[in-house]
Amino acid sequence: MILTMLRAAAAITASLWLGTGLALADTPKKGGTLNFGVVAEPPNYDCHGSTTFALVHPIAPHYSLLVKFDGKEYPKVIPDLAESWTVAPDKMSYTFKLRSGVKFHDGSPLTSEDVKASYDRIISPPEGVVSIRKAYYADLVVETPDPTTVVFKLKNPMAGVMEALASPFNCIYSAAKLKQNPLYPQTEIMGSGAFTFVGHVKGSTWEGKRFDGYYNKERPYLDGYKIFFVKSAAVVPGILGGQFDAEFRGRNPQEKGQLLDKAKDNLEVFEGTWVNNLMLVFNTTRKPFDDVKVRQALSMAIDRWGGSEALSKISILKFVGGVMRPGYSMSLPEAELVKLPGFSKDINKSREDAKKMLEAAGAKDLKFKLLNRNIAEPYTPGGIYSIDQWRRIGVTAEHEQLETKLYQDRVAKGDFDVAVEFQADFMDDPTAQFSKFLTKALSPSGYSGHTDKKIDDLYLKQRRTADVAERTEIVREMERYALTQAYNVPLLWWQRIIVNHKKIKGWHMTPSHYLWQDLTEVWLDQ
């Protein structure tokens, strides 16, 4: 049932093609190097501790997953290391049969022990290892009856198991290397994916080349790929100037127009909804952000509905929504959403109420620093817009923008007042989407520092509820409560616009920029 729901949500996404006409099915060609831009660098190389595209886009081609999402038919789950699987009638056990003869890039064999070691690292990370999604997989126990069989047993019922196992962040590492050093994935690339690691020149490039020992002898088509790390403003000149042919995260409407004005006949455009929102995180360990009225007031000052109309013309920010993607089957209906703090369409009344709430809380003329990434889209416009909205209720915020690693270090340490953060994962499922709204006891990405166990309890309850209608009610209760407490508040959801050179084939856009980035099916028509 969860798969059916996700497919219904994905159906909203539309792909548009602009150029000389849609090509019929082409015969893939081997060879060539795919050059593409990435607008941020990974803070380290560890998939299990990451939430950023800056890691997925360079690193996904180097690793295999147990199973993965099909970019052509999202959210269908297809084999990767697992060639087949069976599900017990009570859905409390999932058994996977691994491909034979799979090798890591160093020539060592990949067996069920490597899958188990990787998932054990996610579920129960050793000291010093960060596992962002450990709460997601807490009910799983991994067993290995033989070298080609992996069994996941559930302690409790769990919704969306196959989709959870298809996470692009669940890279399979070498058990032998993890035993020597559980932290090795942070600084070393050694996977079993279609491309081996060539090199990373910080601030400049990343390169991978075809792995001749890849389990699928017909893949990859490419000889290799090369990434250029650039500022967001350099993507359009980079594509027009021929430095690279693609950027897989997304461009804003103005940039799409610039590209089409200059090179329409050579470009392919994809557009659709995005499983991403920009949100504000209030550090509840610092005053006055420990006061719910202060947090609510700062959310209520922001005109999301007016901002949607204005910002969607110049940025990738567009849709008004709560914790769940607007239009998704489990999200709060708009009629309910507008009753919650920060989502009313009467912005004048909201701002007057917000001023009174701040004064009552002793926070009149509040001043603080807004911590943000130095990535133009959509962080800069989102930060600037929020600061302008707060100014209208007498609040002054200083915009502090940092390089991604420095930003993430500060947020992880709780060294901020308010932060511009994102909520994004590889699918719509609430178990994924609520990860940053939890306490740190349950999720390392609970950056607000709140200790509200009610959210954690509701989270666990929905995760263990198989009945869709019952689960939807729990999710909506959790969403109402989270938005009212306002530890984190969504600003706007994103629109995804991809503009690539039309010679790139085999790449398909999904609602998540984390998916379909292993490049195994990509080829160049040249």
Regions found by a protein language model. Name each.
Residues I498-Q526:
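Long beta-strand-rich cores associated with HINT superfamily self-processing modules
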Residues K68-K72, A166-P220, G224, A233-A234, ...:
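Gly/Pro-rich hinge or "lid" segments in bacterial periplasmic/extracellular proteins
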Residues G213-Q258, Q296, I387-D388, T396-E398:
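Ligand-site clamp/hinge motif
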